[in-house]
Amino acid sequence: KLYADGTADKPIVFTANSTTPTSGYWGGIIINGKAPISGSNANKSDTGLTEIDNNYKYGGNVDNDNSGSLTYVKICYAGARSTADIEHNGLTLNGVGNGTKIENIYILESADDAVEFFGGTVNVTNLLAVNPDDDMFDFTQGYSGKLKNCYGVWESDYTSTEADLR
């Protein structure tokens, strides 16, 4: 479980240790839960999820899984690559349940997706994604939670986006 609970006046900031940070400077936040996912939670290699290490299991049958709380959190310049094929998101929620609290989140310039949901039932309220290099929000493995007041913005001078052929 991860508990990172800031306030509107004092948010918790996860960012690069640099005076000139860029997207992909560090890995990002990854939370593994026990909520339902589609497909096998024993072997995710058949889902094309090369960014997930099969040694770290997630998913199960606990809809209300509590994987902690993120409130008033800023995630900046995440999305580093582990290898040429393994890239990370600003926030990755793997089989996270609706007993987890995710509210008032700001994700700035992630080198991959701002946030990706791999199944799970977690609800997210008040999320702003700015200038990710890939998707604002990505969903796979049967995500079935709810998003409320979640927005994404690409600033007009930001040119590092990638397009998926879908």
Give names to the regions the model predicted.
Residues 1-166:
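Beta-strand/loop edge motif enriched in small/polar residues
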